[in-house]
């Protein structure tokens, strides 16, 4: 049996668009980011969102939807004073704290969220800098282990008021 170019073209198109249609019908075809962090799969925290999966593209509102941390708490912890905290993107923190000389960004938010919610977070071989305002909130909450407190004491820095991001926060 020989296959000419016309039937082959039809077969290719049917396979391509049929596959897309089938995937879409089954709910597997997703073309947008869902902003949902992965969850712990085993142990005491199974089924809960994992703060280690927070990405720079997440907003404080996205974090609030996945974790029990209000956007206003995150804004207070990281010195965000302008605009709606729910729309503030985590990746804007690095630009805000750039002049301080400290790398305060996504990793800092991950650590803050983990400690604030009591979820596990591995800091082995990491030096995650936290602003004093964030550490003060965590210490006031009072659910930290002695090891977590020691880590925060070692990596907490006092920074001046951060420079607002170049793009204003959408209101």
Q: Model segments located where?
A:
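Short, Lys/Arg-rich N-terminal segment immediately upstream of the first membrane anchor
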Residues: 1-6
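Non-cytosolic head/periplasmic domains of membrane-anchored proteins
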Residues: 91-171
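Primarily a LysM-type cell-wall glycan-binding module
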Residues: 43-67, 73-80
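Ser/Thr/Pro/Gly-rich low-complexity linker/stalk segments immediately outside membranes or between
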Residues: 28-48
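Hydrophobic membrane-insertion alpha-helices, especially the h-region
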Residues: 7-25
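Sec-exported extracytoplasmic/periplasmic mature domains
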Residues: 65-69, 79, 83, 98, ...
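Short, structural beta-strand-to-alpha-helix junction motif
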Residues: 56-61, 74, 88-98, 103
């Amino acid at each position: 049996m020989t296959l000419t170019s016309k039937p082959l073209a039809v077969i290719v198109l049917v396979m391509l668009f049929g596959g897309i249609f089938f995937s879409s019908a089954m709910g597997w075809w997703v073309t947008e980011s869902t902003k949902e962090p992965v969850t712990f799969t085993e142990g005491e925290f199974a089924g809960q969102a994992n703060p280690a999966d927070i990405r720079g593209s997440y907003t404080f509102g996205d974090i609030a939807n996945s974790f029990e941390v209000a956007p206003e708490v995150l804004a207070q912890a990281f010195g965000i004073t302008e605009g709606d905290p729910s729309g503030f993107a985590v990746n804007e923190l690095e630009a805000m704290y750039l002049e301080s000389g400290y790398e305060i960004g996504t990793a800092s938010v991950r650590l803050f969220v983990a400690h604030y919610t009591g979820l596990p977070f591995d800091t082995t071989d990491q030096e995650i800098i936290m602003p004093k305002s964030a550490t003060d909130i965590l210490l006031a909450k009072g659910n930290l282990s002695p090891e977590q407190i020691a880590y925060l004491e070692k990596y907490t820095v006092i920074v001046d008021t951060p420079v607002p991001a170049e793009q204003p926060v959408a209101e």
